């Protein structure tokens, strides 16, 4: 029996109805086979995310001027709950996708927003949120992944590793936080790393009891070059961006 939802707007109820329809037609018929396959062959439900993106369900909390739905979080979170009732791995992925795009919608320049957000919010590009490291989980100020500037090209050069990253190896872009100076928490910056960047690689998927379609791996940056235009916010603003995204 479906939960009775108290929604703040009529549009919110329409979104719940749409979500339930998609869950019944697209998610529930696929979940068991997909989870079973992903436990052994690292398959990933990319097309499911494209379906959700085409329906607008990957952009609910993002502003309308960027292609989002501009919905309050009490609507967005109830939509995620509905998805979780059908396929928990996909619900986790919806949350990851929203968080990966959040720095661009909130801290990006107008040019970055117009260039990056259409594919991010439509589901054409899947994102990963790369913050945690083996020695820097809750204390992100102790991260060691570093981005240095190549004076000749102006590019950032990334070296280091991120741990426990959902969508690693399947994402089209990696919202990455790295150290750009040794000034503690004030020395972090945020970069959008293309998924096909040279030097980007991934560890073996974590073995889990469930949520097999939520692929979790280490992300390795081996002299990965990132154009300076893909830095989000000011240099040194990474801590504020990361904490804001986690609060959102």
Regions found by a protein language model. Give the residues of each.
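Amphipathic, small/basic residue-rich leader segments at the start of a protein or domain
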Residues: 1-94, 115, 119-122
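Long, well-ordered alpha-helical segments
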Residues: 19-27, 108-115, 154-159, 190-200, ...
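Glycine-rich beta->alpha junctions and the first turn(s) of the following alpha-helix
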Residues: 3-15, 85, 202-248
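Glycine-rich phosphate/pyrophosphate-binding beta-alpha loops
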Residues: 85, 136, 163-169, 247-248
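A short core secondary-structure module
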Residues: 155-203
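Short Gly/Pro-enriched turn/cap motifs at secondary-structure boundaries
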Residues: 135-138, 164-167, 180-182, 208-215
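A short, Trp-centered hydrophobic/proline-enriched beta-strand micro-motif
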Residues: 123-131
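N-terminal glycine-rich flavin-associated loop
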Residues: 92-111, 137-140, 149
């Amino acid at each position: 029996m479906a939960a009775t939802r108290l929604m703040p707007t009529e549009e919110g109820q329409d979104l719940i109805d749409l979500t339930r329809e998609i869950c019944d037609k697209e998610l529930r018929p696929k979940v068991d086979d997909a989870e079973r396959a992903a436990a052994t062959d690292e398959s990933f439900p990319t097309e499911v995310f494209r379906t959700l993106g085409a329906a607008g369900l990957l952009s609910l909390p993002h502003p309308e001027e960027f292609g989002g739905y501009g919905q309050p979080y009490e609507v967005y979170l109830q939509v995620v709950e509905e998805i979780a009732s059908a396929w928990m791995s996909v619900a986790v992925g919806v949350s990851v996708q929203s968080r990966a795009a959040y720095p661009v919608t909130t801290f990006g320049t107008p040019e970055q927003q117009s260039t990056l957000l259409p594919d991010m919010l439509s589901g054409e590009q899947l994102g990963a949120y790369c913050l945690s490291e083996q020695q820097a989980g809750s204390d992100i100020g102790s991260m060691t992944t570093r981005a240095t500037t190549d004076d000749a090209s102006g590019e950032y050069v990334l070296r280091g590793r991120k741990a426990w990253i959902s969508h690693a190896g399947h994402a089209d872009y990696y919202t990455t936080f790295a150290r750009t100076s040794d000034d503690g928490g004030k020395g972090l910056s945020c970069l959008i790393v293309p998924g096909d960047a040279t030097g980007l690689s991934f560890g073996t998927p974590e073995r889990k009891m469930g949520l097999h379609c939520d692929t979790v791996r280490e992300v390795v940056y081996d002299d990965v070059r990132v154009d300076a235009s893909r830095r989000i916010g000011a240099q040194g603003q990474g801590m504020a961006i990361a904490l804001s995204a986690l609060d959102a």
